[in-house]
Amino acid sequence: MELNGAKILYTIHTDIPLLGDLKITQTLVSTWIVMALLSGFAIWLGRNLKLENVSKRQAAAEFIVERLDQFVHDNMGYHFDKYIPLIGAIFALSIGCNLISVIGLWSPTADLNTEAAWAIVVFVLIMYYKIKTNGILSYLKGLLDPIFIMAPINVLSEVSTPVSMAFRHFGNILSGTVISTLLYWALASLSHVIFGWLPGFLSQIQLFQIGIPAFTGLYFDWFGGCIQAFIFCTLTTIFIKRAAGEE
């Protein structure tokens, strides 16, 4: 039994300093596939919108937008409407990256680089609002509170926000993958113990691997994936709102 990371599918050799060669990985390919599918789905939902006699498709689109608006307003207030597209994009991309494994593709959220990229975006926004609200000098002075020797701990506290967000999401998704894999191999061993004494091809029957792993996979990919997307977006709204204060 092996648990491997994303494979490198192709390498583009470059002479760019520091950047080095560009590696096309399973994570990158799957992420672009998810983005293409989400873009196509959004375009399909937004076609031929009407003010009256709306279709079920338009009603579904309006429901999604209304729920997203309410989610952001409840967590951040009405002064942060400009972040509704960002929160919606992160939520949709997180769910899409989790569910893509259902059709046999590599899940980008099983790669820490994916969550780290999202967390860095959130961290930049947090730093922007802290500096905008307090001023850069006041922000730097705050890192020295209550005494200057606390500066390293305060800096570590700032950096821990994106790190904890990334590892929380990644860890939960990875744990689901590990549990599903262990269950699959445990059921294979159980099938071998029960049917291994039968003659011929009957001894190769993997009865217990049929159905049960699929249900556990659906739980971790669908339910667990949606929960993690919700938690990540909730933390995003809370941290940005806290950094912005009462803007």
Language-model features: where?
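Selective transmembrane helix interface/packing segments
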Residues: 1-247
